[in-house]
Swiss-Prot record:
SUPFAM superfamilies noted in UniProt: beta-beta-alpha zinc fingers (SSF57667)
Reported modifications of this chain: Sumoylation at Lys-67 represses transcriptional activity and reduces cell cycle progression into the G(1) phase. Has no effect on subcellular location.
Tissue: Ubiquitous.
Protein name (record): Krueppel-like factor 8
The species this protein was found in: Homo sapiens
GO BP terms: negative regulation of transcription by RNA polymerase II; regulation of transcription by RNA polymerase II
Effect of K217R: No change in sumoylation. Abolishes sumoylation
C-alpha cells in the first residue's frame, strides 16, 4: 500500500495543470482506496498469528502418509536394465531397498558343477538367423547328477532335481537366458558304433510307483532283451514290465498253444470214461447210453421191437427202430432242395446230394 500511495502522489504532481482531469483521477483513486481495506483485512486473516505460530510437528500422522520416492534419474535407469527378480504386486508391503546401478549391471555367474559337465544341444532359430551351439548345463547346488556307463557307446544320465537356467556363451550375443525344466526321468544317449552297424537300444523301465525300476537293453537285430540293473538304490530288476512282457509273450505263444491243446486232450480223455469191457474191444464213449447200445452188439440183445401189425422186427437201438417204422408209414422227412426228392434216412440224402455236386 505504501508503493500505491507514492504512485498516486506522483500522478497528482504531474497533473496539477489539468484541473478537470485531476478531479476525474481523484474519483478513480478514491474508489481504489476504498477497496483496499478489505484486501488488507483478507491478508491479515491469511497471516494470522495462530497459523504462523503453530508447530508443524503437532500432527505427525500427516507426514507418515507421505512416501519418499527415489529420484526420476534412478528410476529411468532401472527400465534399461534386465529384471532379475520377480515383481511383487501385493499391497501394503515394505519396499525393498534399491540396489546401486553398479550391482545390478554386474554379471551373475552360476556355480560350476563339481563333476564333468554334460552338454545339451540347443538350437535357436529366428526369422533371419538359425544357430546351433553346445551349451553347458547349469546345475544348482541341490541338484544331483548321476551317470551310469554301460557296454558299447550308451550313457544313461539321471537328473534328480530341475535345472533352473541355461547360460549362453559370450560369443552368442543378443540371446537371453532360457529357463530349462528337466523331469526326473532317465535320459538315454545312443550313438552309432564306428563300423556303422545298428547300436543297441536302452529302454528305461518305470515301476508302478513312478520310480526307476532298471532298464532293458534290446538288440535291434535279434530283439532279445537283456536286463541292466540301475544305479539307484531303491530300483529293482522287474521282468513284469510292459516292454519285456510283450517280447516274452511272443516267444511263449507256441508253448501256450501246445499247453492248451494238451489240456483239451486231457479233458476229452476224462470225459470219455465209458469204455467197453469186452475182450478185444477198445471202444470208449462219453455217455453211458451209447456204451449200453454198443454192448448190445456183443450180447445180441434187441429190446426195441416193431409194433406194426404182422411185423416182428427187433432192433438194438431206438433210432434204428424209428427208421424202420418210416417204411410202414411212408414218411420221408429228408428232402433235397435241388430236385425236391425226399428220403426217409439222412444218410441217403447225403449220398444223393453228392451226385448233384459231381454233375
Amino acid at each position: 500500500m505504501v508503493d500505491m500511495d507514492k504512485l498516486i502522489n506522483n500522478l497528482e504532481v504531474q497533473l496539477n495543470s489539468e484541473g478537470g482531469s485531476m478531479q476525474v483521477f481523484k474519483q478513480v483513486t478514491a474508489s481504489v482506496r476504498n477497496r483496499d481495506p478489505p484486501e488488507i483485512e483478507y491478508r491479515s486473516n491469511m497471516t494470522s498469528p495462530t497459523l504462523l505460530d503453530a508447530n508443524p510437528m503437532e500432527n505427525p500422522a500427516l507426514f507418515n502418509d507421505i512416501k519418499i520416492e527415489p529420484p526420476e534419474e534412478l528410476l529411468a535407469s532401472d527400465f534399461s536394465l534386465p529384471q532379475v527378480e520377480p515383481v511383487d504386486l501385493s499391497f501394503h508391503k515394505p519396499k525393498a531397498p534399491l540396489q546401486p546401478a553398479s550391482m545390478l549391471q554386474a554379471p551373475i555367474r552360476p556355480p560350476k558343477p563339481q563333476s564333468s559337465p554334460q552338454t545339451l544341444v540347443v538350437s535357436t532359430s529366428t526369422s533371419d538367423m538359425s544357430t546351433s551351439a553346445n551349451i553347458p548345463t547349469v546345475l544348482t547346488p541341490g541338484s544331483v547328477l548321476t551317470s551310469s556307463q554301460s557296454t558299447g557307446s550308451q550313457q544313461i544320465l539321471h537328473v534328480i532335481h530341475t535345472i533352473p537356467s541355461v547360460s549362453l556363451p559370450n560369443k552368442m550375443g543378443g540371446l537371453k537366458t532360457i529357463p530349462v525344466v528337466v523331469q526326473s526321468l532317465p535320459m538315454v544317449y545312443t550313438t552309432l558304433p564306428a563300423d556303422g552297424g545298428p547300436a543297441a537300444i536302452t529302454v528305461p523301465l518305470i515301476g508302478g510307483d513312478g520310480k526307476n525300476a532298471g532298464s532293458v537293453k534290446v538288440d535291434p537285430t535279434s530283439m532279445s532283451p537283456l536286463e541292466i540293473p540301475s544305479d539307484s538304490e531303491e530300483s529293482t530288476i522287474e521282468s513284469g514290465s510292459s516292454a519285456l512282457q510283450s517280447l516274452q509273450g511272443l516267444q511263449q505263444e507256441p508253448a501256450a498253444m501246445a499247453q492248451m491243446q494238451g489240456e483239451e486232450s486231457l479233458d476229452l480223455k476224462r470225459r470219455r470214461i465209458h469204455q467197453c469191457d469186452f475182450a478185444g474191444c477198445s471202444k470208449v464213449y462219453t455217455k453211458s447210453s451209447h456204451l449200453k447200445a454198443h454192448r448190445r452188439i456183443h450180447t445180441g440183445e434187441k429190446p426195441y421191437k416193431c409194433t406194426w401189425d404182422g411185423c416182428s422186427w427187433k432192433f438194438a437201438r431206438s433210432d434204428e427202430l424209428t427208421r424202420h417204422f418210416r417204411k410202414h408209414t411212408g414218411i420221408k422227412p429228408f428232402r433235397c432242395t435241388d430236385c425236391n426228392r425226399s428220403f426217409s434216412r439222412s444218410d441217403h440224402l447225403s449220398l444223393h446230394r453228392r451226385r448233384h455236386d459231381t454233375m
